[in-house]
Each structure stands twice: as structure tokens, then as C-alpha cells.
Amino acid sequence: NKDEAMALAKRGQDVFFKIENCKKPIVAAVNGFALGGGCELTMACHFRLCSENAKFGQPEVNLGLIPGYGGTQRLTQLVGKGKSMELQMTAHLIDANEALQLGLVNHVTTAESLLERTIDILNVIMSKAPIAIGKIIECVNVAVVSDSAYTNGKSGYDKEVEAFGDCFVTEDMKEGTTAFLEKRKANFQGK
């Protein structure tokens, strides 16, 4: 019935919202098909890599449905209104190169090097200040969401000012600036 369907969609949105707003980076590595809920899951991740053989799509309209776990919103945020409408209304699948061109994925690589490339990027991110990484995630997410319940009525700029202040008083900021002045690699502790 309708109430059960709405509850299912709400639960899915809640799970994907937690992924999207996790303070630690979550990166999707897609090797094969990411359709329907799978595509919605990848879009909830902070960014996406895929192999050359990846395919993406929101084919729910073929079942008389629409994406229910935030896909109508995230796809539009990532690829723009017109292309989002087209992909959802036609159920057209796109390949890795088109996904890259549209901004749905950040990188395309071979299937053999997909995991290695993903880990390389994550290792770079892990070498940065973890509190700052979490604040970047918060600020970027506020920039693409207009829901005042999510943003607590703050603009993205307001959130950025607050997050900058939060980072400014951390031990990581002291370590980062000291390391810069001493011309050495920073050793961030997440404090």
C-alpha cells in the first residue's frame, strides 16, 4: 500500500543520507552495472570511480515507479535538470565515458586498476586533516541541498564560516601550519 511504500522510500533515503553525510569519505568503485537503487547508492557516495565496462541508469520508470532513495534529487544535482529528466524518463543506460562526461563519475579506469586507483585517491585523502575533510563534506552537501530542515536555515556560506572557525581551533590546524612553515609533511591526528 502507499504508506508502506512511502516508509520504504523514507528508510532508503535515511540510509543514503547517512552515507552522504558521513564525516569520513565514502567512495564508490563501480565495476559493472549500477542501476536503480545501486545507482542511487553510488550517487550518495562522496564521489565515484568506475571501470570502462560500467553502466549506470535509473530504469524504475520501466516498472511504473520512480527512484525512491534520493535518486531524483542526487542525479539532478550531479548531471543537471535536463539530462536528469531525460535519463529517468527514458530509462536510458549510460556507459562509463558518458557518466564521466556528465559528471556522474570522477574517474574512469580499467577494471584491473579500479580498486588500486580508488585506494590511491583514498590514501591521499587520508593524509589530510580528518576534521577538515569532514567539514568539507558538510559544506559541500549544504551547497547542493535547499532543504532548510537539513541546513538548519543556514546558507552554504554561513556553514563555511562556521566550519572554518571549527577547523581554526584544532590541533590539526596548528600542526598543518607548523609543518608548512617547517617545510615538512604534516602529521594530522584528528584533534
Residue ranges and their predicted role:
Residues N1, G80, T110-A111:
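Helix-capping/helix-break motifs at membrane-protein junctions
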Residues N1-N31, D158:
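An acidic, glycine-rich surface segment that forms the CoA-thioester-binding/catalytic face
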Residues A5, G12, T72, K81-S84, ...:
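A general structural signal for well-ordered alpha-helical segments in protein cores
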Residues M6-Q13, G36, I66, L93, ...:
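Glycine-rich phosphate-binding loop at the start of an alpha helix
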Residues D14-N21, A29, L35-M89, L102, ...:
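CoA-thioester-processing core
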Residues L49-A54, A96, V105-K159, G165, ...:
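C-terminal long alpha-helix characteristic of the crotonase
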Residues G176-K191:
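Short, basic/aromatic-enriched C-terminal tail that caps enzymatic domains
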